[in-house]
């Protein structure tokens, strides 16, 4: 019994011990690590001074402020060597001194830009300009001074460039200025070439374009100078004086001292993804203990950490059995992987995790900070979050919000209603947007001054303009009495809406809409009409969006009706003189036929679902087969129709039946008539289905006749919902007046035929007048960045003579009418005369009227009669000065006299004649008459440059109505009818707006002077600014989009910055009248939110901007939504240490990462950055914080290696992408002298080149490309006659971020039909000729060597010569992580030892460790091979991969045509984990039989893995149709043929289509070429070229030419174990590589220590106060969770 009891106790102890161990192993998910990861990113250029960056900030804001800053800076005494802090504080102080009271806010933005180093690339560009200028002048860095001292030219203070010589002696400058500038310079001279960013001293000659002394006729003098130097103090005043005299054009360029210190950058993030350890990928030598051998640290001893993993202490086991270290390490990794799997949440625990997370955020003391914390640390916090008791009411609120928020919208960021694109948002871009919006708001506020609330109320005021979108009786009769609309749904009858509220509740009608439920009513109260032009391919893009509205998860409370246009605007078929075009377009299906097929399917038993599926199929087949065509071909239509029948069946008989069906002819004709009558289509050229024009026009959408404004198709559902809520509120008065009721039969007709709109002076149009619907504004005043231009503009605008109705002197003059035009033109005078007449009659009420001359051609001096031009325009310019003696009647009289005889205007020879004709009491020699010419030129300049209005022969005049630009058409019958009809209607609309604005201004609490005159003047300015900034087609930036959020959306929480919160109780409200507010709709689990939230929070706290947040998490989850940790690096303040040295080191510090988790690090960087790690002790691909041992911080430093230039090229001759065009990027003023080359892709004409700050020259490469194409200077010119051919284009890289550029090329005469890519038959012929030539040379060499004598020494030389004469074999490979780099070294050794020919290795740089990049040059020297590191930035248009492994796979196949220089003819890809056993020359020379790719088929001989051969069954078997499925571990690419076939374009286009489905392309690098081998042919290599144990039997191993370590899905054995077991020579090669690495470590040790001291990079070790930072982080986060 006692034995049984003891045994039971023993079992219990074992059980408890194992349970405790299991609990301990699973605690990692909730236990925070005390260790952290510290990452920094530095520039590859040297530090730049903060005061120069500040000067560039000012130059960017206002050039006049820049020169004020320079003048003040020149007064500072720099004899003392000041600290960074003194320079910084002096710069900020100096900045404030040159700013006016209205622009002091700029100092805050300066401090932000200094912290972000925004202008450092610009300063670096100046540094490179100065260096290149010295090289250009053949000047060494060192010069001898007058006292025989040798100093560097940079340290001398500077020099002056005059023509082709430089002057360093101050005493010589005066003489040279008088003597050497006598002859005009050629601005193309590279010595004195100027750039757009240059600092040109402002004088009349270079600021007034109309000056008789053109800037190009003034000699250029460039001062290269250190602005702190004594040289600058002496030279600047001299050059300034000469410039003010108009003698020179003075350009100032900085001389910037070179620096070894690098910039610390920010505006990037990094994620830590939990690693999948199914297959062991950690190097067993990666966890190493440094030991000392002869005083040198060496990494050779594997040291397994002293820890328990699932009950085993592998550290102790290693000590007992050191010979089993490798196997112990493998088993340890296996258990670690199982441990990570055990921490996953169950499905039922995941369901409410989204709501629980939102609940935790809202309940936090600082919700915005909690939002950031949870989104960045979610994997660690998910367990705790899942245990929160669910708040059902919060869930209901979020569900209600999501009825409004489109399902495709995870995040939206608005600033004062401005929609901010968050996908590529950087802190620098967000700072620019905030500054722009701040300037807009404050400019409006300062006009009063006004409160920010008044400004926001004016901005948000909406005026619905309704159109009578109903058919006439005739149009109804044409369609058999039916309306010409195609209905998609019926809210009152369709089953899907059965649960909606059936009646309108009175409580809803008595208050504004506050809940989404308010409008979800089962009534057709809100009807949306969408006008679809079947001749416009955008139709096919919008229909899937419409489908989501009526069939998707987010039903929208509106009846949707489609109105079809099938009447083609394309006249090509009737254009008899363009037979080529006719034949080209005949293959395209007409819009009418497409509409008939759609309607045939819709009216069949397939209904909406079938019709929508048909459009989806059209989209798919079009993008698959004709992605670059803008039309639908017959084959695409046929494939789409067949797809419908195959997928859905249905009763539709055939495509031919649908095309010949006449049932819908009357419907389509009726709808065409309605569209034409109401002018619902834009008259501009649309994106036709039969032509290749590219103007994108969005389909028009109306809600109960009110047009919905939306910026793009993706935003339609959201913007439509906002319009539905607005319209619901608009209809409430109709219910109160019993016009509508719950029993109304036809809501739509009743609403559009009601007299309510006209009775209440609300705009109601009988047709969509484009002049009214297309809003465009100019500004009457603005916060211009050009102060001189602002002063000139206000001088003109404040000196205008306004005409008013004298009988109504008490009128408020709410409308300000300014006629701007060419008064030599009949129409300008005609409209002006009629406006004056109607003003005098009292027809134009509450209006004031004035005129500004704006000639069509300012340089035209004389008219057709040979007399002085623009006499009337010049007279009008000076009318203000005679306002007391002029009346409207006098001016009317003048216009009438001129109009009575139009030829009289050309007969005037002097101003005196027109004054006499006018009867004005003005002396001909009056001073203002004498000044009329200059004033006339000034007013014209203001119109063109400030107001943005150009007079042309087609549009000789424009009328500004409170800033709104109206351009009368030349086709009007007469001026009176135009003004009484269209123009009068527009004035009525603008008057309604003005009255609302007047009320708001009158009630403003800040505005003191509220007299009619003051408010009238204020209103005119405010209306123009609001329209210009917010409501119209913004002239500042047409890409700016604005969005309104319905009031019914519930705000989850509001964030008030600390400054605002602390001062909220202050009595002084004015000081906190912040004109800005963020609104953020955010899904906490979206990857964009991980960087967006910290960015918004940082700017909010820095600039005191409040933030409203609407949380938008998924309401139900089935898997973990975020599996990565994330850290974003942003710091908007500059800090200094105790020595007053700039200590602004933006760092990405990741804390709270479980120590036992294996994570992989991936950078999240801007699209135009290429970076590389330069310091990393540990494997960043396999990070486990426990492996740090005693170290607390894992440090990594990356470097910004290149700034990428991305562009889109267009062949203007054919309007297509010039695919295959070769481009060169040559450095002019940059750090590097290396030329970059690339080819243009067919995909969007995309090209990519690497650069750095400086100036580059983009050219077409010599050869076939330059023989065919020329570069064009003006990419927007469409007329070939205006093309300006240029030899190159200058590219200036002076910012951290580069936007997409455009490049236009045109074909040379006679080259219109010649293909850019050499045809394959030409290529084959050329190849044969080269082969024959080579054979001749080889045979000649053989006979000459046969009779030559040799000795041992010459034998060696000959052997080397023989090898060098052979073709270089180019080997490409990729690797990531220390294990695969170890494999890579072994692969390289196996290649070098077995291949006789010269070898050049190409490695993908992106993921190589710093250690490997330091090692590879030494290995290349030792083993005699070449190598090069290559990279390519993922293009913006190509669907991105997010998982690192899939990104690496992508690089193996997607960019082969552009990854390597154009002179590389062929590459062989060899996997890193492969060993080569043969001479690769055999594979290099192998005939690919016309294919561009050679791959080895998968082995079929190992029957154990038969069940894993997926390509033998199902989809793959059917798709391959007897072709082989190939393995991607080894392949050869004929790059020349590959490019000739545009194979890269086909691979990318197919990838982009297939990758839409996340379940496709599971093995991306392998599946893609195999899938596409029908089009990009693959030559199957003999089987022996690749052997791997997983798929091949053992008998075939002896023939293997390469052996690959394929993963085995049966055993999942780690690769290291397989390598030792399978490959006999692997251990020998591994040891050789290790021994060589040890040898290199020892030889470099002392030299490396010395270099580390000399060139120490910032952040190469943990910063001194890292403990303080971590402590502060822990303290700040303690209350977040």
Curated annotation (Swiss-Prot):
Residues 1-25 form the signal peptide. GO terms for molecular function: UDP-glucose:glycoprotein glucosyltransferase activity; unfolded protein binding. It is found in: Endoplasmic reticulum lumen; Endoplasmic reticulum-Golgi intermediate compartment. Disulfide bonds: none annotated. The keyword Endoplasmic reticulum applies. GO terms for biological process: protein N-linked glycosylation via asparagine; sorocarp development. Residues 566-586 are annotated as: Disordered. The keyword Glycosyltransferase applies. Glycans are attached at residues 81, 148, 174, 391, 1233, 1338. Pathway: Protein modification; protein glycosylation. Its cofactor is Ca(2+); Mn(2+). Residues 1346-1657 are annotated as: Glucosyltransferase. It is an enzyme of class 2 (transferase). Belongs to the glycosyltransferase 8 family. This is Probable UDP-glucose:glycoprotein glucosyltransferase A. The gene is ggtA.
């Amino acid at each position: 019994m006692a034995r049984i009891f003891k045994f039971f106790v023993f079992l219990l102890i074992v059980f408890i011990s194992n349970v405790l161990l299991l609990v301990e192993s699973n605690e990692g998910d909730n236990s925070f690590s005390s260790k952290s990861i510290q990452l920094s990113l530095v520039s590859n250029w040297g530090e730049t001074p903060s005061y120069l960056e500040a000067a560039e900030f000012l130059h960017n804001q206002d050039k006049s402020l820049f020169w004020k800053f320079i003048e003040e800076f020149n007064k500072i005494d720099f004899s003392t060597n000041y600290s960074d802090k003194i320079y910084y504080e002096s710069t900020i102080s100096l900045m404030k001194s040159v700013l006016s009271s209205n622009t002091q806010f700029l100092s805050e933005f300066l401090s932000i830009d200094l912290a972000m180093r925004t202008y450092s690339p610009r300063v670096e560009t100046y540094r490179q300009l100065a260096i290149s200028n010295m090289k250009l002048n053949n000047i060494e860095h060192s010069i001898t001074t007058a006292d025989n001292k040798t100093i560097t030219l940079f340290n001398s203070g500077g020099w002056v460039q005059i023509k082709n010589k430089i002057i360093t002696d101050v005493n010589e400058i005066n003489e040279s200025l008088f003597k050497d500038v006598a002859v005009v310079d050629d601005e193309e001279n590279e010595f004195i070439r100027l750039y757009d960013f240059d600092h040109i001293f402002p004088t009349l000659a270079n600021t007034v374009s109309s000056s008789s002394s053109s800037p190009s006729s003034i000699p250029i003098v460039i001062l290269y100078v250190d602005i702190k130097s004594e040289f600058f103090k002496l030279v600047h005043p001299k050059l300034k004086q000469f410039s003010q005299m108009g003698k020179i054009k003075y350009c100032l360029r900085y001389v910037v001292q070179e620096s070894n210190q690098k910039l610390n950058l920010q505006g990037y993030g990094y994620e830590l993804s939990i690693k999948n350890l199914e297959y062991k990928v950690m190097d067993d030598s990666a966890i190493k203990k440094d030991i000392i051998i002869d005083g040198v640290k060496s990494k050779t001893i594997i040291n397994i950490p002293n820890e328990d993993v699932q009950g085993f202490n592998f550290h102790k086991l290693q000590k007992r059995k050191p010979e089993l270290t490798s196997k112990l390490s493998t088993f340890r990794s296996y258990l670690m992987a199982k441990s990570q799997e055990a921490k996953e949440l169950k499905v039922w625990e995941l369901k409410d995790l989204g709501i629980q997370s939102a609940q935790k955020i809202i309940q936090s003391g600082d919700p915005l900070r909690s939002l950031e914390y949870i989104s960045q640390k979610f994997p660690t916090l998910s367990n705790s979050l899942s245990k929160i008791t669910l708040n059902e009411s919060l869930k209901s609120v979020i569900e209600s919000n999501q009825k409004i928020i489109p399902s495709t919208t995870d995040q939206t960021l608005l600033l004062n209603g401005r929609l901010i694109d968050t996908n590529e948002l950087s802190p620098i871009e967000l700072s620019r947007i905030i500054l722009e919006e701040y300037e807009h708001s404050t400019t409006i506020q300062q006009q009063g001054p006004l409160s920010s609330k008044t400004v926001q109320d004016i901005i948000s005021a909406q005026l619905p303009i309704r159109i009578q979108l109903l058919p006439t009786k005739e149009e109804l009769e044409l369609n058999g009495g039916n309306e010409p609309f195609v209905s998609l749904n019926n809210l009152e009858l369709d089953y899907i809406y059965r649960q909606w509220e059936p009646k309108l509740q009175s409580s809803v009608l008595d208050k504004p809409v506050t809940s989404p439920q308010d409008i979800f009513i089962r009534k057709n109260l809100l009807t949306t009409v969408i006008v679809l032009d079947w001749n416009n391919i955008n139709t096919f893009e919008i229909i899937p969006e419409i489908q989501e509205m009526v069939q998707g998860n987010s039903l929208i409370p509106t009846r949707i009706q489609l109105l079809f246009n099938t009447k083609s605007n394309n006249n090509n078929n009737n254009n008899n003189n363009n037979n080529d075009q006719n034949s080209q377009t005949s293959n395209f299906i007409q819009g009418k036929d497409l509409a008939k097929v759609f309607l045939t399917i819709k009216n069949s038993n397939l209904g909406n679902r079938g019709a929508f599926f048909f459009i989806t199929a059209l989209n798919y087949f079009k993008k698959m087969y004709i992605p670059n065509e803008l039309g639908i071909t017959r084959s695409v239509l046929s494939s789409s129709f067949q797809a419908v029948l195959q997928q859905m069946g249905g009763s539709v008989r055939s495509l031919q039946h649908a095309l010949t069906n006449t049932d819908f002819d009357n419907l389509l004709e009726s709808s065409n008539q309605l569209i034409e009558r109401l002018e619902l289509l834009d008259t501009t050229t649309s994106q036709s289905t039969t032509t290749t024009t590219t103007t994108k026009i969005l389909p028009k959408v109306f809600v109960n006749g009110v047009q919905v404004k939306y910026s793009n198709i993706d935003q339609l559902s959201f913007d439509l919902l906002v319009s539905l809520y607005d319209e619901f509120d608009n209809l409430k008065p109709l219910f109160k007046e019993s016009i509508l009721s719950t029993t109304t039969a036809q809501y739509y007709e009743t609403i559009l035929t009601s007299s309510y709109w006209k009775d209440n002076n609300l705009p109601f149009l009988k047709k969509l007048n484009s002049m009214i619907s297309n809003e465009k504004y100019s500004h009457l005043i603005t916060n211009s960045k050009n102060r001189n231009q602002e002063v000139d503009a206000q001088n003109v605008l404040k000196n205008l003579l306004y005409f008013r109705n004298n009988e109504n002197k008490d009128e408020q003059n709410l409308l300000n009418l300014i006629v701007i035009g060419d008064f030599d033109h009949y129409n300008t005078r005609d409209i002006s005369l009629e406006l004056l007449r109607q003003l005098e009659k009292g027809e134009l009420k509450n209006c004031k009227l004035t005129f500004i001359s704006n000639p069509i051609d300012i340089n035209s001096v004389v008219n057709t009669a040979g007399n002085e031009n623009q006499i009337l325009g010049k007279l009008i310019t000076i009318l203000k000065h005679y306002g007391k003696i002029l009346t409207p009647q006098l001016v009317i009289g003048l216009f009438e006299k001129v109009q009575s005889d139009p030829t009289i205007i050309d007969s005037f020879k002097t101003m005196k004649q027109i004054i006499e004709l006018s009867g004005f009491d003005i002396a001909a020699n009056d001073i203002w008459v004498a000044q009329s010419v200059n004033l006339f030129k000034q007013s014209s300049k203001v119109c063109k440059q400030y107001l943005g209005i150009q007079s042309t022969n087609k549009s000789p005049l424009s009328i500004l109505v409170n800033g709104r630009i109206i351009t009368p058409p030349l086709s009007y019958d007469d001026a009176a009818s135009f003004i009484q009809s269209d123009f009068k209607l527009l004035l009525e609309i603008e008057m309604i707006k003005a009255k609302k604005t007047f009320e708001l201004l009158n009630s403003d609490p800040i505005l003191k002077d509220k007299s009619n005159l003051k408010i009238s003047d204020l209103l005119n300015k405010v209306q123009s600014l609001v329209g210009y900034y917010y409501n119209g087609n913004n002239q500042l930036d047409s890409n700016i989009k604005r969005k309104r959020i319905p009031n019914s959306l519930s705000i989850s929480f509001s964030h008030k910055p600390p400054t605002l919160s602390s001062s909220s109780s202050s009595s002084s409200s004015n000081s906190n009248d912040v004109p800005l507010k963020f609104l953020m709709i955010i899904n906490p689990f979206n990857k964009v939110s991980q960087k967006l939230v910290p960015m918004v929070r940082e700017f909010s706290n820095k600039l005191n901007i409040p933030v409203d947040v609407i949380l938008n998490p998924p309401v139900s989850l089935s898997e973990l939504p975020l599996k990565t940790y994330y850290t974003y690096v942003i710091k908007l303040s500059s800090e200094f240490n105790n020595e007053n040295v700039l200590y602004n080191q933006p760092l990405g510090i990741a804390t709270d990462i479980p120590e036992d988790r294996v994570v992989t690090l991936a950078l999240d960087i801007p699209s135009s950055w290429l970076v590389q790690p330069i310091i990393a002790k540990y494997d960043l691909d396999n990070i486990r914080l426990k492996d740090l041992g005693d170290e607390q911080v894992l440090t990594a430093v990356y470097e910004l290696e290149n700034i990428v230039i991305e562009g889109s090229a267009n062949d203007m001759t054919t309007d297509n992408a010039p695919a295959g065009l070769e481009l060169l990027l040559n450095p002019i003023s940059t750090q590097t002298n290396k030329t970059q080359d690339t080819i243009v892709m067919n995909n969007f004409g995309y090209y990519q080149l690497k650069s750095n700050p400086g100036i580059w020259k983009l050219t077409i490469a010599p050869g076939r490309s330059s023989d065919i194409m020329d570069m064009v200077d003006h990419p927007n010119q469409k007329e070939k006659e205006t093309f300006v051919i240029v030899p190159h284009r200058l590219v200036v890289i002076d910012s951290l971020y580069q936007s997409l550029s455009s490049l236009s090329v045109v074909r040379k005469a006679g080259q219109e039909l010649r293909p850019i890519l050499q045809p394959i038959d030409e290529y084959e012929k050329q190849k044969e000729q080269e082969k024959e030539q080579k054979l001749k040379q080889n045979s000649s060499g053989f006979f000459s060597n046969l009779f030559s004598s040799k000795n041992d020494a010459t034998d060696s030389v000959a052997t080397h010569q023989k090898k060098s004469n052979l073709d270089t074999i180019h080997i490409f490979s990729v690797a990531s992580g220390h294990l695969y780099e170890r494999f890579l070294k072994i692969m390289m050794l196996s290649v070098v030892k077995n291949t006789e020919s010269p070898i050049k290795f190409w490695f993908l740089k992106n993921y190589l460790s710093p250690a490997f990049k330091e090692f590879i040059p030494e290995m290349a020297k030792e083993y005699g091979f070449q190598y090069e590191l290559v990279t390519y930035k993922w293009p913006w248009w190509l669907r991105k991969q997010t998982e690192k492994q899939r990104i690496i796979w992508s690089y193996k196949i997607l960019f082969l045509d552009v990854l390597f220089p154009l002179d590389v003819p062929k590459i062989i890809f060899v996997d890193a984990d492969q060993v080569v056993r043969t001479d690769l020359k055999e594979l290099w020379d192998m005939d690919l039989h016309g294919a561009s790719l050679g791959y080895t088929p998968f082995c079929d001989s190992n029957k154990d893995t038969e069940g894993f051969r997926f390509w033998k069954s199902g989809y793959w078997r059917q798709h391959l149709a007897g072709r082989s499925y190939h393995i991607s571990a080894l392949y050869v690419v004929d790059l020349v043929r590959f490019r000739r076939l545009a194979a890269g374009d086909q691979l990318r286009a197919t990838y982009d289509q297939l990758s839409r489905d996340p379940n496709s392309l599971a093995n991306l690098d392998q599946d893609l070429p195999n899938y596409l081998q029908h089009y990009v042919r693959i030559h199957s290599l003999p089987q022996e070229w690749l052997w791997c144990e997983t798929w091949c039997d053992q008998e075939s191993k002896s023939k293997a030419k390469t052996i690959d370590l394929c993963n085995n899905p049966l055993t999942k054995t780690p690769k290291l174990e397989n390598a030792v077991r399978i490959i006999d020579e692997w251990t020998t090669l591994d040891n050789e590589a290790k021994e060589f690495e040890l040898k290199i470590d020892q030889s470099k040790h002392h030299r490396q220590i010395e270099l580390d001291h000399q060139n120490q990079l910032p952040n190469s070790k943990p910063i001194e106060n890292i403990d303080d930072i971590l402590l502060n982080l822990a303290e700040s986060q303690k209350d977040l969770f």
